C-alpha cells in the first residue's frame, strides 16, 4: 500500500466511523491524530517520562459521556526547560513506526510557558499533524511536580481503527480525582473550570475508589461544595453553559 493510498484509506475509514457514530469527522480526526502521537511516544525513549492525564484518560477508563478534548495533558518527569520539551516532542514526532497515515512535522514544534495560573508550572507545546492534506493542530500541556498516588500505571490507549494501540504511563483514577479537588480548593470561588466538577461527578458515578487513598484530598471540606460557591449566580450560569457545550 502506498503512502497516498494509506492516507486516503484512513481518511475514508474515519469518515465512515464518523457517520456510524454520528460524530463530527473533524473530532474523530483530532482523536486519531492524538492517538497516533501517543503511539509514537510509546515507542520512544520518553514513554515513561510523560505520564498521560486529563480528559484522554476518561477514554482509557471507558467512562460513558467522556467529554471531547483537543489537547493532550501530561505530567512531566523530565527537565522542564522549553528547549528540552521542544527536543523531546520533535523526537517523538520523528519516531519511526508502522505506517498509519499520520505525519507530525518536527519543524513546526513550538513551546511556551503556561501562564494561566502563576503558581502552575507548565509548558505548552504546539505542532502540526498531517493526514494527507488534512492539517491537525496539535497541543500538549505538560505539568510538573505533582505526586502520583498510588503511582503511575501502564495503560493501553483505545484505538479508533485497527492500528497498534499505544501502551504508556497514565494516571490512576485516584490521582485524577485528587488533582481536581485540589483545583477546587485552591481556586475557591474564582473557579471557572466546570470541567473539574463534571469529571469528578463522572468518575464518582462510574467507578469505586479506595476511600483511604482519597481521604486526604477530601478531608479539607472543599469550599467548592458550600453554598457560598454552589448558589452563586455566576457559578450556576457557568455550569449551565458547560452542560450546553457538552450537548453540542
Predicted regions and their residues:
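Structured mid-to-C-terminal alpha-helical surface segments
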Residues: 1-51, 60-68, 72, 76-248
Amino acid at each position: 500500500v502506498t503512502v497516498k493510498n494509506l492516507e486516503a484509506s484512513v481518511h475514508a475509514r474515519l469518515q465512515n466511523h464518523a457517520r456510524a457514530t454520528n460524530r463530527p469527522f473533524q473530532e474523530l480526526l483530532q482523536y486519531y491524530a492524538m492517538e497516533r502521537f501517543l503511539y509514537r511516544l510509546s515507542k520512544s525513549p520518553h514513554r515513561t517520562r510523560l505520564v498521560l492525564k486529563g480528559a484522554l484518560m476518561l477514554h482509557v477508563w471507558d467512562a460513558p459521556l467522556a467529554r471531547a478534548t483537543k489537547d493532550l495533558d501530561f505530567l512531566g518527569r523530565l527537565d522542564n526547560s522549553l528547549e528540552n520539551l521542544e527536543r523531546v516532542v520533535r523526537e517523538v514526532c520523528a519516531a519511526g513506526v508502522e505506517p498509519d497515515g499520520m505525519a507530525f512535522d518536527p519543524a513546526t514544534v513550538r513551546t511556551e510557558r503556561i501562564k494561566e495560573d502563576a503558581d502552575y508550572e507548565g509548558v505548552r507545546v504546539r505542532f502540526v499533524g498531517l493526514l494527507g492534506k488534512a492539517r491537525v493542530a496539535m497541543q500538549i500541556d505538560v505539568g510538573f511536580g505533582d505526586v502520583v498516588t498510588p503511582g503511575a500505571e501502564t495503560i493501553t490507549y483505545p484505538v479508533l481503527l485497527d492500528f497498534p494501540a499505544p501502551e504508556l504511563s497514565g494516571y490512576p483514577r485516584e490521582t485524577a480525582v485528587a488533582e481536581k479537588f485540589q483545583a477546587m480548593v485552591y481556586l475557591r470561588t474564582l473557579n471557572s473550570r466546570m470541567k473539574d466538577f463534571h469529571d469528578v461527578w463522572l468518575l464518582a458515578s462510574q467507578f469505586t475508589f479506595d476511600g483511604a487513598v482519597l481521604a486526604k484530598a477530601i478531608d479539607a471540606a472543599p469550599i467548592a461544595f458550600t453554598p457560598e460557591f454552589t448558589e452563586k449566580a455566576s457559578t450556576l450560569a457557568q455550569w449551565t453553559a458547560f452542560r450546553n457545550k457538552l450537548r453540542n
